[in-house]
C-alpha cells in the first residue's frame, strides 16, 4: 500500500503555491482542498510517490511510477456535517487487495468517521470503522478503530504533539514522547504543514494517513519534530530546509536500528 511508514516510499505532489489565495468557504465534499492545511501548497515530490491534483487543486491520486499500488480520492456533492452519506471516498489498491473508505466530514472539512471495507479478489473479507476527534485548534487528537479496539491519543503542548499513546486489545500500551528542540537545534517552524504521523509521531492509523495530504485530517503541528522516544528506543530527525523554509530532506535514524532513512522533498 501507499503509506508513510518506515521502510516505504512516500508521496509526492503536482501542486502550486496557493498561499496568496483566500481560503474559500467549504459547503460540501467537492469543496475540500489541501490548501486549507498546506498554506504554501503541497510538495511536488517526496521520494518516488506522485500526488496528482485535479483542476481545483484537490488530491485525486497517490501513485508510484511503475507500480500498481495507488490511492485515489473521489469527492462527493454531499453537505459537510451530513451523516447520511460520505463526502469523500478513498480507495487504496494493492492487487489483489483493495481498501475502500467512506469518509464522513465535519463542518470544517475534516474526517470524523470512516467506514472501511477490505476486498481481496473483489470479495469482501473484512470491515472496520474509524472515528477521529480534533482539539480547539482543529488538530487531530484522537483516533479509534473497531479492529482490535485500537485507540490512539495525541497530546499537544504549544501547538505540537508531545506524546502519543496507543492502546490495542491484547497488546501492551505504547507511549511515545516527541521533542521539538535539542541542545544544538532550536525549534523549526512547520511552515509547509508536513506531518508524518507514523514515522515521526508513532501514530499509526494504517492506510488512512494519506487522507492528511488531501487536507482531511486536521491542521499541522507548529514545529517539525526533532526526536522521539518509546520504551528507551530513540529516534532522531534531521531536517534540511530551503531558503523558504520548505523541508527538502528528512534524514532519520533509530537507536535500535543500524540503518538510516532518507526522504527527499521537491517543491
Name the predicted role of every residue range.
Residues 1-5:
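Sec-dependent N-terminal signal peptides
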Residues 10-13:
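C-terminal motif of bacterial Sec signal peptides marking the signal peptidase cleavage site
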Residues 16-267:
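Buried hydrophobic residues that stabilize the cores of well-folded domains
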Amino acid at each position: 500500500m501507499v503509506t508513510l511508514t518506515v521502510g516505504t516510499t512516500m508521496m509526492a505532489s503536482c501542486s502550486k503555491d496557493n498561499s496568496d489565495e483566500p481560503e474559500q468557504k467549504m459547503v460540501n465534499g467537492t469543496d475540500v482542498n489541501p490548501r486549507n492545511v498546506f498554506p504554501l501548497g503541497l510538495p511536488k515530490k517526496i521520494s518516488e510517490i506522485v500526488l496528482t491534483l485535479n483542476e481545483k487543486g484537490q488530491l485525486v491520486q497517490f501513485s508510484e511510477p511503475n507500480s500498481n499500488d495507488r490511492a485515489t480520492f473521489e469527492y462527493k456533492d454531499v453537505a459537510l456535517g451530513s451523516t447520511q452519506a460520505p463526502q469523500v471516498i478513498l480507495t487504496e489498491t494493492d492487487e489483489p487487495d483493495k481498501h475502500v473508505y467512506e469518509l464522513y466530514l465535519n463542518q470544517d472539512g475534516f474526517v470524523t468517521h470512516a467506514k472501511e471495507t477490505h476486498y481481496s479478489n473483489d470479495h469482501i473479507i473484512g470491515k472496520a470503522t474509524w472515528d477521529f476527534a480534533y482539539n480547539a485548534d482543529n488538530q487531530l487528537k484522537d483516533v479509534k478503530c473497531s479492529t482490535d479496539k485500537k485507540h490512539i491519543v495525541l497530546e499537544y503542548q504549544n501547538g505540537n504533539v508531545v506524546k502519543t499513546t496507543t492502546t490495542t486489545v491484547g497488546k501492551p500500551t505504547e507511549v511515545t514522547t516527541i521533542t521539538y528542540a535539542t541542545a544544538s537545534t532550536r525549534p523549526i517552524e512547520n511552515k509547509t504543514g508536513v506531518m508524518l504521523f507514523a514515522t515521526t509521531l508513532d501514530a499509526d492509523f494504517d492506510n488512512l494517513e494519506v487522507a492528511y495530504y488531501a487536507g482531511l485530517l486536521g491542521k499541522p503541528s507548529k514545529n517539525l519534530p526533532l526526536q522521539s522516544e518509546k520504551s528507551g528506543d530513540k529516534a532522531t530527525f534531521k531536517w534540511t530546509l530551503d531558503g523558504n523554509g520548505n523541508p527538502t530532506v528528512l534524514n532519520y535514524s533509530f537507536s535500535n536500528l543500524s540503518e538510516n532513512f532518507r526522504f527527499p522533498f521537491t517543491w
